C-alpha cells in the first residue's frame, strides 16, 4: 500500500529556528499533497502554520531545557524524558505500519534521548533527519568553543572526556557527555536507526563513522524558497554578514578583513562579539536582529554575502538565499556552504582561516558578475523536497512488505 500517513516528531510546534521550520514546512507540503500528517512535539505554542485539514497536532506543552524554571527538572528530563517517550509510544500505536512513516527531526532541546527507544523498536518505519551533530557529538557541533576550532576528537573518547569544549561551563560539558552516553546506551541511537537523512555532504562526512554500517542513508537537502527578486549585486559596494555575532560564526574575522581591504561592511544580527566588532571596524554598521523580510532587504545592498563561519555547519540557509537572488558568496571550503559555491562563478572559496586570506577573497569576489541560479533553484525547491520525501517514504515502506 502507498504512503498515506506521516507522523512528524520534533522538539517544537512553532517556528523558532531552522530545524522546526523544516519540520513544519514539510508537514504543510505533505498535507497539501493529500498525506494525513500527525505532528508530535514536546513544546508549544502551536504554530498557525499547522492549521490544515490534513494536519493533526499533538503538543505536550512541556518546557524546553532552556526555558524550564527548574534547573534540576531540566537536567533530569533532558537526560530521559519519560513523559515524552510514553506519549510518543501511545501516538505510534494509532498508526498502521503498512501505510505510515515516522519522521523525526531531533530531540536535543526537549524530547531527550528517551524517544530513541520508540524510534528503534520497529513499530513503525522511522526516518531520522540530522539537522546538527548531536547523534555523535556531545555539544552538537564538532567544534571546540574554547579553542575556537573544529574538533576532530572522537566523541566520548578519553581526549573528548578530558577536554572542556563547551561554550558555557565545564558542568554543561559533563551533563552533555552523560546525555550522549545515555543516547548511545538505553536510547539506542544512532546505531539502531535504520534510515537517516543528511542535509549536506559535509555533515555526512563528519557523521558517517558514528552511524551503523548497514544504515540506509538518504540525501535530503532542506527546502529553501527564493526570498525575492534578483539583485544587481555588481551595482553594490557593501559586504554583508547575516547571523549571530559569536566567535564560531567568524564575524570579528570578517570585520578585520573588511577594514583591511577597505570595503563597507554590514552586520545583520547581534551577539557577544558585537562590541569587539565595533572596536575592530568602527565604520561598520550593525543592525541587531531583524525580521526575515528585513534580512532580504539587507541582501539587496550586498556586493557579496560573507559567510566566515569557523565550523562545519550543516546546510546554512542564508548563503543559499543570497545565491538564489544573485548575490555571490565568500566562504571557507570547510563549511557546508561551500557545497553550493562554485569558485570564481558564484562566489569565492578559501582554505585558511586568517584575516589576510579573507581580505583577499573579498577583493577577488569583485570580479564575479551575473550567474545562473536555475540548478540551485531546482535542488532546494519545496517541490523537489516533497518529491524526495515521498520517494524515501515509499522506499522505506516497500522494504517492509
Task: Locate predicted features.
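N-terminal strand-loop element at the rim of the active site
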Residues: 16, 33-82, 91, 271
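Short acidic/histidine- and often glycine-rich active-site loop of Leloir-type glycosyltransferases
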Residues: 319, 334-344, 348-349
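Short hydrophobic beta-strand element within catalytic cores of glycosyltransferases
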Residues: 328-331
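A charged, aromatic-enriched C-terminal amphipathic alpha-helix characteristic of glycosyltransferases
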Residues: 369-400
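A conserved mid-protein helix/loop that constitutes part of the nucleotide-sugar donor-binding site
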Residues: 21, 240-260, 272-275
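Nucleotide-activated donor-binding/catalytic signature segment of Leloir-type glycosyltransferases, i.e.
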Residues: 275-294
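Conserved acidic donor-binding segment of nucleotide-sugar-dependent glycosyltransferases
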Residues: 288, 343-344, 348-355, 363-368
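Membrane-proximal helix-turn-helix segments that form the acceptor-binding/catalytic region
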Residues: 121, 134, 150-196
